[in-house]
């Protein structure tokens, strides 16, 4: 999957660089609770999913943060994911090095 509104970013987790803080363009489907793969929310009040790996998790924010995958978090025993409080202030997966050290429960 390509990036949405981010220029030349890769589709995989962690593939987006610093230029991915813009909003989503067309083709971003799904609501805030529907991301189960490596997707993140746009900066601001998120209303759709974006295939970039930088964006807003779990509500509104002014600074892009790195989201984690629900699947990766489950494998580390966290049980959280995008749309469930995944923001950079806390990190329950930090010691295990998963979820880009951004997962919080």
Swiss-Prot record:
Keywords tagged on the record: Keratin, Repeat
Additional comment: Human have a similar number of genes as other primates despite the relative hairlessness of humans.
Name of the protein this chain belongs to: Small cysteine and glycine repeat-containing protein 6
Region (13 X 2 AA repeats of CG), start-end ranges: 4-83
A Gene Ontology term for the protein's cellular component: intermediate filament
Family: Belongs to the KRTAP type 28 family.
Summary of the function given for this chain in its UniProt record: In the hair cortex, hair keratin intermediate filaments are embedded in an interfilamentous matrix, consisting of hair keratin-associated proteins (KRTAP), which are essential for the formation of a rigid and resistant hair shaft through their extensive disulfide bond cross-linking with abundant cysteine residues of hair keratins. The matrix proteins include the high-sulfur and high-glycine-tyrosine keratins.
């Amino acid at each position: 999957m390509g990036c949405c509104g981010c220029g030349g970013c890769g589709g995989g987790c962690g593939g987006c660089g610093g230029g991915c803080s813009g909003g989503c363009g067309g083709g971003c489907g799904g609501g805030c609770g529907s991301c189960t793969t490596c997707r993140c929310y746009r900066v601001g009040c998120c209303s759709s999913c974006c295939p970039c790996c930088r964006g807003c998790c779990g509500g509104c924010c002014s600074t892009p943060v790195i989201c984690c995958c629900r699947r990766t978090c489950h494998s580390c025993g966290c049980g959280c994911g995008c749309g469930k409080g995944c923001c950079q202030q806390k990190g329950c997966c930090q010691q295990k090095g998963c979820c880009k050290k951004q997962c919080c429960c």
